[in-house]
């Protein structure tokens, strides 16, 4: 299968990584390799590319083969960024990029089971070795747990109705395909909700997050990224939904202002020191022109921070 991957907020990403010759950068979400390719073009540097999907990793490695040993592909979840960096014999890196969510390659491949618009198996695993699939979640989770997931991870207002419909239907026959599930979700929501965004969008997002343990991975990945950054190194994160963006925003805030002393204390006694300086006080978003060219960019938000020299 061919990639049709268009990197989001490309120029903004390059600008905020503050590239320099001789630097080492981690593209923690390699995907189609578009961001990595531009980094390697713009500076005489090295890029370590992480992806947990071996198919995506192999495609990107072919795309970036002209850069020779300046590109280092590694099959790994970015929650393991510290282990990867140290295993490669690197003490620290000059920048980390995280472009979150599902890559175009995964979305456009029905066999991956991420899309509610193309029929495929209920899979949704970013790492094919992950034992948990979307079918496991949909067919075995108790109704209360489905409601919680749809509320928390999908911010879906009709979570109870959808969960009830899923449980009722699976008692007769388990769900096996993405379109089966999408059609059941459409039937479960009120008619007015069907006229807005596709009714299955939030539920599919929630199931995907559960299958891949995405929020915990992001928390661990952010912590690891800060630890492997050199002083003055940058971390750039692109998010695609409010849960991710809120998590990144709050993490950056905590790292910039970590003091937990009561406000009426005359001085800090907790000993917690800031490790980051936030570069983007407000998230950067794509221009109308970029959104016209790439509809998948419409919900993207970019946040960046720099590691402090005394951290």
Swiss-Prot record:
Q: Where is this region: Disordered?
A: 289-311
The record's function comment reads: Specifically methylates the N4 position of cytidine in position 1402 (C1402) of 16S rRNA.
Question: Which GO MF terms does the UniProt record name?
Answer: rRNA (cytosine-N4-)-methyltransferase activity
Q: Which residues are listed as membrane-spanning?
A: none
The record lists S-adenosyl-L-methionine as bound by 33-35, 51, 78, 99, 106
What is catalysed by this protein?
A: cytidine(1402) in 16S rRNA + S-adenosyl-L-methionine = N(4)-methylcytidine(1402) in 16S rRNA + S-adenosyl-L-homocysteine + H(+)
User: Where is it located?
Assistant: Cytoplasm
Q: Which keywords are on file for this protein?
A: Cytoplasm, Methyltransferase, rRNA processing, S-adenosyl-L-methionine, Transferase
One cellular component (GO) term of this entry: cytoplasm
* Domain of life assignment: Bacteria
Q: Gene3D superfamilies annotated for this entry?
A: Putative methyltransferase TM0872, insert domain, Vaccinia Virus protein VP39
Provide the primary localization. cytoplasm
Where are the annotated coiled coils located?
none
Single GO BP term: rRNA base methylation
In the Enzyme Commission scheme, what number(s) does this protein have?
Answer: 2.1.1.199
Record's keyword annotation contains Transcription regulation: no
CDD domains the UniProt entry points to: AdoMet_MTases
What does the similarity note say? Belongs to the methyltransferase superfamily. RsmH family.
List the PANTHER family hit by this protein, alphabetically: 12S RRNA N4-METHYLCYTIDINE METHYLTRANSFERASE, S-ADENOSYL-METHYLTRANSFERASE MRAW
What is this protein's name?
Ribosomal RNA small subunit methyltransferase H
Concerning InterPro entries, the annotation shows: RsmH, SAM-dep_MeTrfase_MraW_recog, SAM-dependent_MTases_sf
Cytoplasm as a keyword of this entry, yes or no, is: yes
